[in-house]
Amino acid sequence: MQYAYDAMKEVLDENKWLHVFPEAACWAFYPAIRPFRIGVFKLAVEENLPILPMVVKHRKPNPIWRIFKKHPNAKLIIGAPVVPDNSLDTKEKISDLEYRSRTEMMRLLGLDNESNQRLIDSLPTYHVESKSLFK
């Protein structure tokens, strides 16, 4: 894991754009926000950088559209930047940044904590490797 963290830090040091799925993976058609890994938030706090919350909403094409297009539709929704709160100590700052980023991502999907947790509880806890959507 240290290798991945160092690689992310190197990208930021070069002033490049860094996109990370804080859940550690992107599962197509998974409607909930899964638990986050804390590393990206720790890095954002260390570098004093904002998090730009984004969610991908997938939906299958309606029956008419399936005639012309067989791949599911995806919509990228970008939220407001979430900036580290410099009035907090480092540990609290990381936790707060993670919480506010998660809250913004759920808002973008139209979820609250309860409905998000119900979705997580109702869905399988395993992931079967899926085929690429673009083949």
Residue ranges and their predicted role:
Residues 3-135:
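Non-catalytic C-terminal accessory region of glycerolipid acyltransferases
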